[in-house]
Amino acid sequence: MNIVLLGPPGSGKGTQAKMIAEKFNVKHISTGDILREHVRNGTELGKEAKKYMDAGQLVPDSILIGIIKDRLSKPDVAGGYMLDGYPRTIPQAEALDKILPELKQKIDVVLNIDVPDEELVRRLSGRRMCKCGRSYHIIFNPPKVPGKCDECGGELYHRDDDKEEAILNRLKVYKQQTQPLIDYYTKAGLIANINGAGEINQIFDEISKVLSKFQ
């Protein structure tokens, strides 16, 4: 079973990805991780990607699809995989559609974790940081003493990109980028929309019901 996982920042996608990989025995392939691995190992693709990353530019699709193809060619994905962070755009989805037949693979389902904006803002704006690196959440993971770090007693602060205006901006960019992709996979009959507003286990139950059809 091969899955594409979509979800906005704050949707709990990372948590669900771990649970899916464990229960359904599929390889979790995070684009960011494999890109960094290529750069670390100094592969040809990694060297190319590093030039763009060092210049603060986006890595071109032609390099990304090479890195994805390389990963999907490895024997450990034979039992199935879950792509997380790729594709993000229509050209990337089209590039993926081109290479999959060469690898004798196909995408079975595209999980789209859907969460209302106000819930995403609540989740993301509650984060508080300490200079020592610890992070907290005023609702989900509060410090023992409000405003103080449990580890070092330091003053907690609210990062600018965790403030409501910045979050709404990030979500707007995500939607502009991802909506065409959702439409693309809806047309292909692959989309499964998941209500991501509930509790972690509740969301996972819904995902499990969808995925059990492909086992």
From Swiss-Prot:
> Is-annotated flag, keyword Signal?
no
List the protein's name. Adenylate kinase
Q: Where does Zn(2+) bind?
A: C130, C132, C149, C152
Subcellular locations according to the entry: Cytoplasm
Which GO biological process entries does UniProt record here?
AMP salvage
Q: Which GO terms describe its molecular function?
A: adenylate kinase activity; ATP binding; zinc ion binding
Q: Which reaction does it catalyse?
A: AMP + ATP = 2 ADP
What positions does the entry give for ATP binding? G10, S11, G12, K13, G14, T15, R127, S135, Y136, G198
Family the UniProt entry places it in: Belongs to the adenylate kinase family.
Q: Where is this region: NMP?
A: 30-59
Q: Return the GO cellular component terms, semicolon-separated.
A: cytoplasm
